[in-house]
Amino acid sequence: MQDFARMGIDEVYIQPITLVADQCYQQMRKQALKFLHSNEYGFTQVNIGKPLLTSLGVKNYADDYEATLESIVRHVNTKALNKSVVLMANGQNQLEFSTLQLKAMYGAAPNVVVFTTNGFPTFKQALTFLDRMGHKDLLVVPLALIGSTHLMDYLGGERSDSIYALLAEEGYNVDIWNEGLGENPHVQDLFLKHLGQAIRMSDRKRPMPRESVKPVMTNSRLEAQGLIS
């Protein structure tokens, strides 16, 4: 931001690459807005785009949850054909992941099951859901932007407590998707759309320039002018 100020840039648009409005997102947003409120840098606009999972699709707003589910299923479709997709999120107390499961259940992606490592829905609840669905072939997809080595080991490593091992122990045929959402071009497009929304919202709030209005003479003024001349 300091470099932008030195370059004479006074409008900045930031699109955080985050799934939910968690503590990291809020801290980043707070830090960025400090530059707007400081007279030292001269910014007139600092606008921050929303996380991937924000809008529920009510009152003519876009449905981020449905769009995210569609983007994931579309990207993994060749490998997920005739399989249930299990999304694993590294979440804690975020309601967005349970909302994502509800959106899937209500028709957006009925073959998708969501669980979190430290929150709700739990892995045990996902097992109950999978049992009711009756599908034995699964594709586990990390609901994370980066498919780190640690994450992939937790999902499909040779350790006895990996998600692969736990699901196989329950009698499922399991494949692991070895990419984060950040490599999904359809998810990338969703982030770009959020950035576009931030820009459009800023344009709507921008005060319209006043047009110069020429004075119009009334009849009485015209008559008075004629008498004077």
Describe these PLM feature segments.
Residues M1-L139, A144-S229:
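Extended amphipathic ligand-handling, pore-lining, and cofactor/metal-binding catalytic surfaces
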